[in-house]
Amino acid sequence: MSGQEDWESEIDNPPACVPNLSNSEPAFKASNQNYFSSNNAFNRTTERGFGNRKASDDCNQNFEFSERGFGKQRAGSDANQNFESSERGFGNRRGKGRGGFGTFGKDSNGKQESGDFTNDDNRTIDDNRRRGGFQRRGGFNDETSGRGRRGVRGGTSFSGFGREDGNEQSGFTSNDGFNNETSGFGSGRRGSRGDSSFSGDRESDRGRGFGRGGFRGRNEDIGVESGKGQEGFERSEQGPRVTYIPPPPPAEESDIFKHYQTGINFDKYDDIVVEVSGSDVPPAILTFEEANLCDSLAKNVCKSGYVKLTPIQKHSIPIIVAGRDLMACAQTGSGKTAAFLLPILAHLMVKGVESSAFQTLKEPEAIIVAPTRELINQIYLDARKFSYGTCVRPVVIYGGTQMFHSLKQISEGCNILCATPGRLLDVIRKEKIGLTKLRYLVLDEADRMLDMGFREDIENLLKSSGMPSKEERQTLMFSATFPSSIQSLAREILKPDYLFVVVGQVGGACSDVEQMVIEVDEFGKKDKLMEILQEIGSERTMVFVKTKKKADFIATFLCQEKVPSTSIHGDREQKERETALRDFRTGQCPVIVATSVAARGLDIENVSYVINFDIPDDIDEYVHRIGRTGRCGNTGRAISFFDKRGDDEQRIARSLVKVLSDAHQEVPAWLEEVAFSAHGSSAYNPRSNKFASTDDRKRGDSRGDYSTSGFSPSAAQAEEEDWG
């Protein structure tokens, strides 16, 4: 055809003359590096580039680098192509790369295309796997969806605004963020350090924290093992970085020492039976004067409204002052926090503190660990109250808050460190605190930490560098329940001659709580809850449910029914959790719906009712839940919904009957029938094997001379009754 272009002929017969570009210079020359190497080597590292990668191994390709050039392509045969890429330029990539704003590249098999529409092995471009990026030497097309075709001189750089994976995905970079193998914008091997910083949609490529990369080069590490950068930002694996800074604690003295009055039943504590087992037991004290507190501490105790010692305080304070390890078990709301804080503070104030704000490495003398953020913050407020106006500085750190804030608090001086296990291990790994001067290690709610997911954290804490051995430190463990299995674990932490204090009925519910069990099926619980709340009115009520989703659902349902409510559970952000507790404490929301996160140790003023919307399958959890009311001699009521067909109800039935009987509460006849039918079934977990009523060392394991104080044989016999 004369005068017309023969496209078929041009495609089948490539031009005989190929321009020689070997003498071309790059756009920006920033180093003396040889741009045209002939040794067919692959340079696998880039520094701060916009995504330079090696070519596919299918052909003998040669990548050459300039430090700041834009890079360009050299001419050559299909089987031996040479590429230049820039270490700081708009990187050149191989087929499966995830690099920069593409200049001349390759297709997914490492073969260069020789025409607009076909490559050398005569496959159409639509058959190739496509990536997003600036392609065809300037056009922007998403090849994944088949839009656009590659240009004559190479393919795309497989990045820019796109993702790899062979399907269309969005995002500015292809590998989930700005950083990958060599940081810069995009680029890098999958699985390299700091896999993703500003994560996109792909779960498999998500990294933790800022990682290595982001806005820095390969060797400029700003990430740490637990996903928290040195700048103090925490990042979850799927969420944004944590920037929440909790509000400062109250500064006014009247707010610091604000307290609620003890109830009319507080004097009944004098009648509670106490057992202390072990050798050489220090005698109990009866008044605060006998504790020999320094003047400043004694004044703060008085300002806090403490007039009379509780049973756990009478026995624990002299034991701790004597330097003995202690495992103390007392019912909820009986003053366990003051029982370990007062002797620790008294010792630090008399002997003097060693940690100073002027030291680079802060070394606290006491570390207090609790399983929940709310509980550890409460312990801190008590420590701050008792140490007010003294040389002792308590600090609290916990997850869900900005790491930088935690480190800042520590840097200002730290004598008593209150922490949750995870955040404590983080600051130890960062070497922000030292442990060589540690005198006291306190585990509050110790049974939960050893038995419910925190055991590994506690073991890692005890193995931390600088941690004194158990012979060199004083270890104190407190809880409302100490099952036998936990006692066996605790003996690995405590000295062999530790003392065991039992107050009242171990694992039993507080006698100041009126307990009621109501038979109701699953579908009638909401109506029954509304009926009870309408009768209660504006009295402060905690509603416990089993799942996080149900907590939000019930709270929303109550709000729709014009009952001001809020919720608290582990999936809520720390700011939301603290706001919920504040609204509940102030009475803005008289009803709070919670999971077990709020069942441990929280001391909220004037909680009149606890409602178990979902009864727990573990009797320990039941005891802790109802212990949110009836505290410090105040009376309270606990109402539990019981669905006889529920699995959890079957598991707890017989243990629940015993708890009710021990607390002199009425046991419904139908509940006794359920408990009897559950006897011997797989759903029944015998309470006698779960609860420890006395020191396990007394059960045939005689490793010392054990004495008892205030011990009632008849009471112990009842507690040890075998329900199995």
Swiss-Prot record:
Residues 512-675 form the Helicase C-terminal domain. GO terms for cellular component: pi-body; piP-body. Residues 108-130, 693-704 have a biased composition (Basic and acidic residues). Residues 317-500 form the Helicase ATP-binding domain. ATP binds at residues 330-337. One of its GO terms (molecular function) is ATP binding. Its EC number is 3.6.4.13. It comes from the Eukaryota. One of its GO terms (biological process) is male meiotic nuclear division. The keyword RNA-binding does not apply. Residues 168-182, 683-692, 705-715 have a biased composition (Polar residues). A motif (DEAD box) lies at residues 444-447. Residues 1-11 have a biased composition (Acidic residues). A motif (Q motif) lies at residues 286-314. It catalyses: ATP + H2O = ADP + phosphate + H(+). The keyword ATP-binding applies. PANTHER family: ATP-DEPENDENT RNA HELICASE DBP3. Probable ATP-dependent RNA helicase required during spermatogenesis to repress transposable elements and preventing their mobilization, which is essential for the germline integrity. Acts via the piRNA metabolic process, which mediates the repression of transposable elements during meiosis by forming complexes composed of piRNAs and Piwi proteins and governs the methylation and subsequent repression of transposons. Involved in the secondary piRNAs metabolic process, the production of piRNAs in fetal male germ cells through a ping-pong amplification cycle. This is Probable ATP-dependent RNA helicase DDX4.
